[in-house]
């Protein structure tokens, strides 16, 4: 979990650094740089993908649950982030689908119930609907 939390903290730090480099009028009328286009977002995506594919998360159901719980709650745990960061925190949830298969059914069911309440249907992105469906299927394997 320390490594996962470290990924998020490093991402937030990179975003802050990118924000400091922006000029006051950047992004105005589509001119100049925009924080949403900063390379730190792609780097975070790749780092999280590598973490989920290359660590013990898939081999330990307990670690899988902790990692998914953290990733799914991150948009709520960091409410004061830039909008581009918020959307990235939602988008990376799609990377978690292979890890869901490693969950114990009861853990998948618990995450499913929480996720369904935390992300109302009218506010969900398509990737979140996919995550929810995968959690539901894994929870029924009991």
Where are the regions that the model predicts?
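Non-catalytic all-alpha helical scaffold/repeat segments
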Residues: 1-142
């Amino acid at each position: 979990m320390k490594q996962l939390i470290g990924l998020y903290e490093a991402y937030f730090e990179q975003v802050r650094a990118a924000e400091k480099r922006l000029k006051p009028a950047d992004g105005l009328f589509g001119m100049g740089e925009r924080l949403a286009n900063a390379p730190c977002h792609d780097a975070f995506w790749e780092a999280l993908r590598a973490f989920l594919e290359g660590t013990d998360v898939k081999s330990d159901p307990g670690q899988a649950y902790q990692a998914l719980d953290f990733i799914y709650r991150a948009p709520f745990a960091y409410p004061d982030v830039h909008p581009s960061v918020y959307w990235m925190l939602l988008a990376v949830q799609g990377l978690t689908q292979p890890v869901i298969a490693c969950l114990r059914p009861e853990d998948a069911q618990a995450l499913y119930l929480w996720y369904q309440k935390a992300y109302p249907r009218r506010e969900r992105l398509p990737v979140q609907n996919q995550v929810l469906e995968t959690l539901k299927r894994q929870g029924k394997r009991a």
